[in-house]
């Protein structure tokens, strides 16, 4: 899966995110639930968007590589 494909998928699903969640929380949980690679990106690749929304694109780039 390409970064662009994954980003489009996640951004489409983000319309359904709980209002109390930040975008990074949603992205992390969505990737973890659907693809089970979020923790590998967080701990092995050292990219965490759960606590920092500025890392969303970089997180998705690393996740896309792991999903391929």
Where are these regions (language model features)?
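N-terminal acidic leader/helix
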Residues: 1-28
């Amino acid at each position: 899966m390409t970064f662009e494909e994954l980003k489009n998928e996640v951004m489409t699903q983000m319309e359904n995110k709980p209002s109390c969640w930040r975008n990074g929380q949603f992205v992390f949980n969505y990737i973890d639930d659907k693809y089970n690679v979020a923790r590998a990106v967080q701990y092995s690749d050292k990219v965490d968007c759960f606590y920092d929304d500025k890392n969303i694109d970089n997180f998705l780039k690393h996740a896309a590589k792991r999903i391929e």
